[in-house]
């Protein structure tokens, strides 16, 4: 089980990403616009740098919904490998069965 502080930190990051998503997209559109002047693009780049560091989506880490474990995460199920295995053995995941050859 991950520390509660780490799980809360990830939730805080997710809120920041949602809060600043529109602003970031607007500034990035200006930066990548070839028709905009160099000064406008530079100003947009400076404003983008002024946004909180944690508002960038790449700062987020996928975590297991049950345990908060950051490694061994299966995005399709939203679970870590251990909890996914337990759920599969109980038959909680439809269509998933243990492989054997």
Curated annotation (Swiss-Prot):
Pfam families for this protein: Ribosomal_S14 (PF00253)
GO molecular-function terms, A-Z: rRNA binding; structural constituent of ribosome
GO terms under biological process: translation
InterPro entries: Ribosomal_uS14 (IPR001209), Ribosomal_uS14_bac/plastid (IPR023036)
Domain of life of the source: Bacteria
Coiled coil: none
Complexes and interactors: Part of the 30S ribosomal subunit. Contacts proteins S3 and S10.
Function in brief: Binds 16S rRNA, required for the assembly of 30S particles and may also be responsible for determining the conformation of the 16S rRNA at the A site.
Family assignment from sequence similarity: Belongs to the universal ribosomal protein uS14 family.
Name assigned to this protein: Small ribosomal subunit protein uS14
Organism (species): Chromohalobacter salexigens (strain ATCC BAA-138 / DSM 3043 / CIP 106854 / NCIMB 13768 / 1H11)
